[in-house]
């Protein structure tokens, strides 16, 4: 399937499920099950309940999707608390 056929929607994470999956409530009121995309998993971008996310979905299965972007939330600017590795 070509990337041009994907639907991109905005939503909010409302539940954390096992195996790296999330329950996402979309802006249009539908609820889907989504997983994190490869780049988000590679760079260990964490998502929690209440985060605004951008989800890609195929038109063939409108109950599943892939989280491709997590909206940045303020409060992590200069002088913030840093965690050591």
UniProtKB/Swiss-Prot annotation:
Q: Does the keyword rRNA-binding apply?
A: yes
Q: Which superkingdom?
A: Bacteria
Stored Pfam families: eIF-1a (PF01176)
| Family that this chain belongs to | Belongs to the IF-1 family.
Entry's Gene Ontology cellular component terms: cytosol
Please give the PROSITE patterns that the UniProt record associates with this protein. S1_IF1_TYPE
PANTHER family found in the cross-reference section: TRANSLATION INITIATION FACTOR IF-1, CHLOROPLASTIC
NCBIfam families referenced in this protein's UniProt entry, alphabetically: infA (TIGR00008)
Domain S1-like positions: 1-72
> Which InterPro entries does this entry report, sorted A to Z?
NA-bd_OB-fold, RNA-binding_domain_S1_IF1, TIF_IF1
Concerning Gene3D superfamilies, the annotation shows:
Nucleic acid-binding proteins
Q: Which GO terms describe its molecular function?
A: ribosome binding; rRNA binding; translation initiation factor activity
Per its UniProt record, what CDD domains does this chain match? S1_IF1 (cd04451)
Q: Which UniProt keywords apply?
A: Cytoplasm, Initiation factor, Protein biosynthesis, RNA-binding, rRNA-binding
Oligomeric state and interaction partners are given as: Component of the 30S ribosomal translation pre-initiation complex which assembles on the 30S ribosome in the order IF-2 and IF-3, IF-1 and N-formylmethionyl-tRNA(fMet); mRNA recruitment can occur at any time during PIC assembly.
Localization, per the record, is: Cytoplasm
Identify this protein by name.
Translation initiation factor IF-1 2
- Whether Nuclease counts among this entry's keywords is no
The job of this chain, per UniProt, is described as: One of the essential components for the initiation of protein synthesis. Stabilizes the binding of IF-2 and IF-3 on the 30S subunit to which N-formylmethionyl-tRNA(fMet) subsequently binds. Helps modulate mRNA selection, yielding the 30S pre-initiation complex (PIC). Upon addition of the 50S ribosomal subunit IF-1, IF-2 and IF-3 are released leaving the mature 70S translation initiation complex.
């Amino acid at each position: 399937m070509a990337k041009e056929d994907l639907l991109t929607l905005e939503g909010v994470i409302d539940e954390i499920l096992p195996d790296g999956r999330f329950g996402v409530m979309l802006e249009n009121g539908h609820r889907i099950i989504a997983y994190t995309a490869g780049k988000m998993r590679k760079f260990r971008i964490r998502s929690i309940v209440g985060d605004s996310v951008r989800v890609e979905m195929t038109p063939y299965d409108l109950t599943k999707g892939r989280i491709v972007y997590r909206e940045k939330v303020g409060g992590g600017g200069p002088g913030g608390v840093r965690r050591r590795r």
